[in-house]
Amino acid sequence: MPRGPGILATTRGSTITITFVGDGIELHFLSDQLGGRVRITVDGRSRNFDLYASHAIDRLLGWADLGSGTHVVRITALGTHRAGSRGTRVLLAALRVLAT
């Protein structure tokens, strides 16, 4: 799992926007018992993910073949969680831009 300070959010609506030049992107999140739900929007297309896991794991979410050029990723904490989760944490541990 990537190590570093990461970017943490627990509050509903907390958002980070990343603009990159490439063909794709990999986002590494920490999934564990405190994991919440997150919305990831890539070039205007949104999808929700659940970051809960019964033990700590690296959750890799990736997008490839976006086409060479500039792309925008928006990561938004939804402030919700599934039954069994003890938190609403969204922790982006690392990202990697895929070359064109």
Predicted feature residues:
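Glycan-recognition surfaces in beta-rich domains, encompassing non-catalytic CBMs
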Residues: 1-100
